[in-house]
Amino acid sequence: MSSDWDSVTIIGQKARVGGGGPRENVAKTSSQLNAARRAGLVVGTEKKYGTANTKSNPEGQRLTKLDATDDVVAVKKVDVSVGKAIQQARQEKKLTQKELATKVNEKPNVINDYEAGRAIPNQQLLAKLERALGVKLRGKNIGEPLFAKKK
């Protein structure tokens, strides 16, 4: 009454009972991989990845949801008021778009897109711009000083 349910397949060192078969090893170069294929060995490919330093991106989740639907949905763009606030704060600090871009480690055309209202909002970049310009760019009170003086 032996079935596939009862059998166990062992892969690796213990699979070679008696030590006769080829050893399991990792091919590091394409020549090693091709040699294994020519020899008729079983070749498996596994992707190694670590999840310790990665975090999920909610924007990516939203885009995946958009892919799943059949509806045509317009992509969110930066509001014009945010673009004007960036432009005014930048001019008050006497910065060019290029200088501001360098300050926040971005390309000048990205700053241009934000000021024109063409860019897709990126929370990390908006936070950098807020700190560099000292002006709120998210939530309520867009354009007000980041740290308003207390009364």
UniProtKB/Swiss-Prot annotation:
**Region described as Disordered:** 1-32
**In terms of domain of life, where is this protein from?**
Eukaryota
The UniProt entry's GO CC annotations, sorted and at most eight, read: cytoplasm; nucleus
User: What is the name of the protein in this document?
Assistant: Multiprotein-bridging factor 1
Protein family membership: Belongs to the MBF1 family.
Name the SMART domains on file.
HTH_XRE (SM00530)
Q: What GO molecular-function term can you cite, just one?
A: DNA binding
Occurrences of domain HTH cro/C1-type (ranges): 86-140
Identify the taxonomic lineage of the organism of origin.
Answer: Eukaryota, Fungi, Dikarya, Ascomycota, Saccharomycotina
Listed A to Z, the keywords are: Activator, DNA-binding, Transcription, Transcription regulation
At which residues is the DNA-binding region annotated? 97-116
Q: Which InterPro entries match?
A: Cro/C1-type_HTH, Lambda_DNA-bd_dom_sf, MBF1_N
Q: Which GO terms describe its biological process?
A: cellular response to nitrogen starvation; GCN2-mediated signaling; maintenance of translational fidelity; rescue of stalled ribosome
One Pfam annotation, family name? MBF1
The free-text function statement in the UniProt record for this protein reads: Transcriptional coactivator that stimulates GCN4-dependent transcriptional activity by bridging the DNA-binding region of GCN4 and TBP (SPT15), thereby recruiting TBP to GCN4-bound promoters. Involved in induction of the ribosome quality control (RQC) pathway; a pathway that degrades nascent peptide chains during problematic translation. Required to prevent stalled ribosomes from frameshifting.
SUPFAM superfamilies assigned to the protein according to its UniProt record, in alphabetical order: lambda repressor-like DNA-binding domains
